[in-house]
């Protein structure tokens, strides 16, 4: 990410959120890379009184890495571009958390995000996290969002100390169980390269490593480095907060089912998915209310921060659901959402490597297998699954004597469940059919696996991440050069390097149109031309010209262009804000805000509407470009 436009964008984000002082230090670190305190003071032109408190605050916001060398004891500082970029994604993250866990959880997440990292005891004293007094003895809407409880206990007193942990600590537990917040570790304040070098230094000093030689020593150091790095940076808080792979207190889509519905799920005979009935019943015994009003406080000295890697996984799943909604029915998309929700709980990050893998060089990475019965449990029982797939006809041949088999309701096992819903076996089969639809080309959103005789479903993450990148590039090429160029690019991507004649034969295009399209795309950097001479003379008449399409180079180029476009949007927004500075200061006054029609003239009201429309347009464009960055870089 360390490029000119990425550094420019991150500096603009830091200035927009934290002010000019932070931006000056951040820009100096991005320009000169890694600096100690005297050099940073010299290049930034700041005094110790300005620099030291600002560095401490930037370290708390995780905008700056710091590392003290073991050789000379000097502390070096380095800009954290990744953490600075996540400032542009803060609104999207808070919107997602509010939709998933409720408004109060989003408020807690916003407070942690604003502080960089925070101690639990400090969060207890924040005014914005205090419960509203109006909900003392009534129904608490925020608490209902987090735990799924419908009412608070009637014995609550109006004491502030009794209310506060009943609301804050369960919310923190739910956020930790989902993986959205993690424990702060010391290694998280150091860059990835510094952590690797430090781990290698520790490993090479061990006697058992010193006794090894050659390739064996290198392999042991690499393996030990990965283990030690994971141990030092692991801040997982989900231990003890998960039940059967699902966070305690997580809301299920069918949490409001009728009281007449059975507490235990019906036995299912489809493909032996419920072979171990006792285990399934034990899993189904816990409910959304198990963690409801669990006032056991979290450790007051625990320091937590936002886990952006986990939130990238959740946002990536949202993109997968959008693809499913384009080509499948709403019921199929909801089934897919239940599968992805289960997978999300057990997926810590989008990919294992920090660097973006090259096309064709990364191995396939499958998600954890999710049992079909678990997906069927999470699907809303009121959802009509049979309406969007073909009718299920199971032929029942007569037995040897030609007698008609007994009806199921004769023995009291009617296939129709409560409220006319199908039985567990039929419904599990229907869920499997919907997942089979998603496994079909061209997207192949799911993959079926048989594990120990049970049907499980997985998602091929790297394949879908590549598919997202290709779809984004194809959409861009079609918008710029038309559908003919899109056809040419698809041929080159499928066949590799081709000369003009062979490309014309496959694409079935006239030479004139083909050459025009290739020339325009080459000028735009989407296709390249390779010259292969037939002899040492290198004459043009004795040279083969091969056209090819390199998605890795194009993705990197598009990523840099996207950084540049986002920077220009922020610069334009700042210019427009400075141009209307006096007017905007007037509209932000406490007496004017909310009473614009009373204190502003008609011309000022029209100007205010124009400014809001322009601001919404630029911020919306930045959000759209951020989606492209996530596809090209993060997913």
From Swiss-Prot:
It is found in: Nucleus. The keyword Zinc applies. Residues 411-424 have a biased composition (Polar residues). One of its GO terms (cellular component) is RNA polymerase III complex. Transmembrane segments: none annotated. Residues 131-164, 246-295, 386-424 are annotated as: Disordered. Keywords: DNA-directed RNA polymerase, Nucleus, Transcription, Zinc. Residues 272-292 have a biased composition (Acidic residues). The keyword Manganese does not apply. InterPro entries: POLR3C_WHD, RNA_pol_III_RPC82-rel_HTH, RNA_pol_III_Rpc82_C, RPC3, WH-like_DNA-bd_sf, WH_DNA-bd_sf. Gene3D superfamilies: Winged helix-like DNA-binding domain superfamily/Winged helix DNA-binding domain (1.10.10.10). One of its GO terms (molecular function) is single-stranded DNA binding. SUPFAM superfamilies: Winged helix' DNA-binding domain (SSF46785). Belongs to the RNA polymerase beta chain family. Component of the RNA polymerase III (Pol III) complex consisting of 17 subunits. This is DNA-directed RNA polymerase III subunit rpc3. It comes from Aspergillus clavatus (strain ATCC 1007 / CBS 513.65 / DSM 816 / NCTC 3887 / NRRL 1 / QM 1276 / 107). The gene is rpc82.
């Amino acid at each position: 990410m360390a490029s000119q436009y990425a550094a420019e964008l991150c500096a603009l984000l830091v200035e927009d959120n934290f002010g000019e002082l932070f931006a000056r230090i951040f820009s100096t670190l991005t320009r000169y890379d890694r600096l100690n305190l005297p050099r940073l003071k010299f290049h930034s032109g700041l005094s110790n009184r300005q620099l030291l408190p600002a560095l401490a605050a930037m370290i708390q916001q995780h905008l700056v890495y710091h590392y003290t060398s073991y050789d000379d004891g000097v502390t070096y500082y380095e800009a954290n571009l990744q953490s600075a970029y996540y400032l542009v994604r803060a609104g999207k993250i808070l919107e997602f958390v509010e939709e998933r866990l409720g408004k109060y959880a989003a408020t807690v997440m916003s407070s942690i995000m604003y502080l960089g990292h925070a101690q639990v005891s400090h969060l207890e004293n924040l005014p914005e996290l205090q419960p509203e007094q109006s909900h003392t003895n009534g129904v608490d809407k925020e608490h209902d969002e987090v735990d799924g409880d419908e009412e608070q206990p009637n014995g609550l007193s109006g004491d502030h100390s009794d209310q506060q942990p009943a609301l804050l600590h369960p919310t923190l537990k739910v956020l930790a169980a989902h993986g959205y917040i993690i424990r702060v570790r010391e290694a998280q304040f150091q860059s990835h390269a510094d952590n690797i070098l430090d781990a290698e230094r520790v490993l090479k000093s061990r006697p058992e490593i010193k006794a090894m030689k050659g390739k064996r020593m290198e392999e042991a150091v690499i393996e030990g480095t990965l283990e030690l790095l994971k141990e030092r940076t692991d801040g997982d808080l989900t231990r003890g907060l998960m039940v059967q792979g699902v966070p305690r207190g997580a809301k299920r889509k069918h949490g409001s089912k009728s009281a007449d519905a059975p507490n235990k799920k019906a036995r299912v005979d489809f493909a032996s998915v419920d072979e171990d009935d006792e285990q399934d019943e034990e899993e189904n015994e816990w409910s959304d209310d198990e963690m409801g009003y669990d006032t056991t406080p979290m450790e007051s000295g625990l320091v937590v921060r936002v886990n952006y890697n986990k939130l990238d996984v959740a946002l990536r799943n949202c993109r997968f659901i959008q693809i499913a909604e384009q080509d499948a029915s709403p019921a199929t998309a909801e089934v897919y959402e239940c599968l992805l929700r289960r997978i999300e709980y057990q997926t810590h990050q989008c990919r294992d490597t920090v660097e973006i893998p090259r096309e064709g060089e990364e191995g396939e990475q499958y998600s954890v297998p999710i049992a079909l019965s678990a997906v069927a449990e999470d699907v809303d029982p009121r959802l009509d699954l049979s309406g969007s797939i073909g009718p299920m006809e199971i032929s029942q041949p007569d037995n040897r004597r030609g007698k008609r088999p007994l009806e199921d309701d004769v023995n009291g096992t009617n296939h129709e469940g409560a409220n006319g819903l199908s039985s567990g076996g039929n419904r599990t089969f229907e869920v499997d059919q919907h997942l089979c639809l998603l496994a079909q080309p061209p997207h192949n959103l799911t993959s079926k696996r048989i594990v120990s005789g049970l049907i499980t479903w997985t998602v091929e993450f790297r394949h879908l991440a590549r598919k997202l990148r290709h779809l984004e590039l194809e959409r861009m090429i079609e918008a710029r050069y038309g559908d003919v160029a899109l056809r040419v690019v698809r041929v080159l991507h499928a066949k590799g390097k081709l000369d003009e004649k062979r490309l014309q034969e496959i694409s079935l295009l006239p030479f004139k149109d083909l050459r025009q399209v290739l020339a325009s795309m080459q000028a735009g950097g989407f296709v390249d031309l390779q010259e292969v001479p037939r002899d040492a003379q290198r004459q043009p008449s004795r040279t083969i010209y091969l056209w090819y399409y390199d998605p890795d180079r194009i993705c990197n180029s598009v990523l840099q262009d996207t950084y540049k476009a986002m920077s220009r949007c922020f610069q334009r927004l700042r210019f427009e804000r400075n141009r209307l500075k006096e007017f905007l200061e007037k509209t932000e006054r406490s007496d004017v805000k909310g009473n614009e029609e009373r204190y502003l003239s008609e011309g000022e009201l029209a100007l205010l509407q124009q400014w809001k429309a322009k601001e919404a347009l630029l911020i919306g464009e930045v959000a759209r470009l951020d989606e492209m960055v996530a596809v090209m870089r993060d997913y």
